Amino acid sequence: LLIEKEIWPRDKICGDAVGGKSLSHVKELGVLDMIESTPHYVVDSIVFGSANGSEVRVMLPKESYEKMGLQSGYSLPRMQFDYMMFKRGQEIVRENGGSVIQGFSVNEITVEKTEKGHKITGITGNIGGKRSGNENMTFTSALTIGAGGYNCPVSRVITEIHNEPHRDDDHFCGGYREYWDNVEGLGGEEGPIEIHFIDEVLPGYFWLFPVQGNRVNVGIGMLISEHRKLKADRKKSLKKIQKWVINEHPRFKKRFANATLVSGSEKGWQLPFGSPRKNSPSPFQPRRAAMAGAVCVGDAASLVDPFSGEGIGNALLSAKLTASHFDKDLHKDGFTEEAAIEYMNNLWGALGSELTNSKTLQKVMKWKLLTNWFVKKASKKEEIGKMMSEMIASKESQKILWSPWFLMKTLLLP
């Protein structure tokens, strides 16, 4: 049974970039051909900009990526991408004798006490929400999978039962997005996406991601804890900060002079990062995401990359991992606590290294002087650009950045 709160197609607030890691899972699900038959933007490079005005364009060469079994990535509205994924998801569910319910609000997670503790056995809710007056329905299952985003009711119950925190503002990011048409220097069917670390947005970043035609996803992301630390003269909403950047910033106001805001596209949201928690009461990283009877995937398991902000790839990986840990015969009386622990350990085993590396990169980008210096150096030294391309393609390559020999050879030497 697939239960969905919204009626599809629906908007999803996001940066709209779909990286190569995500596309490999999309291809496996049989959706890639569908995406490629619809309008989309091919990402061939990433432009990184620093506060002092330096920029470096890191190429994502298609041929090199294909040799590694990867794709450089696409950018397209999540309403479009998600609808195709949901369409395929419905087909798979129905082909296997299941059902799909849209517009269903989960009001309660059903929990039973057991000899070993607690077990989630299902959900209760109704179509249209509590105020609709519609009759409540209860569904039970050997396994309940929570995929409801940063505030997923399944993930909240899992952490509450174990008396562990669900939210940590040091690992939650606020995001704000708008769509603009005709931003200077961007558009077409293929080209760069842009990420800028500028004074007015640090310790967050400002992005420009073309999606199709002349339309561009424009947004800001910043850790919620860092946003709260801003001094009074800078403590504005992300919406107001973005408005200033677009209208007043010397590097961007000319680019937006003839651009048009798409009415109704101004929306904010939150991203639960998968960065490791220090001194956490939970024995699992980044937080507890499963228990007897239930697992969480994607944002509900707090798996968003803390540097890039991308969550699709890790969401799809966690969903695939969930399927491999559930055995309908072995778990016919309920998904066990032992299986839940194995899932969480294997999940962190698969993602922990890259999420930890990304957290380190996120922290480095807070240091304005270092970011200015690095981007300026990279813009003049081809070797650094090639290294950054490899880092984007392979998270394992990020480890090279922290090698003392690499720092001396690549950055310090002329």
Which residues does each predicted region cover?
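Short loop/edge segments at beta-strand edges and connector loops
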Residues: Y83, Q102-F104, S263
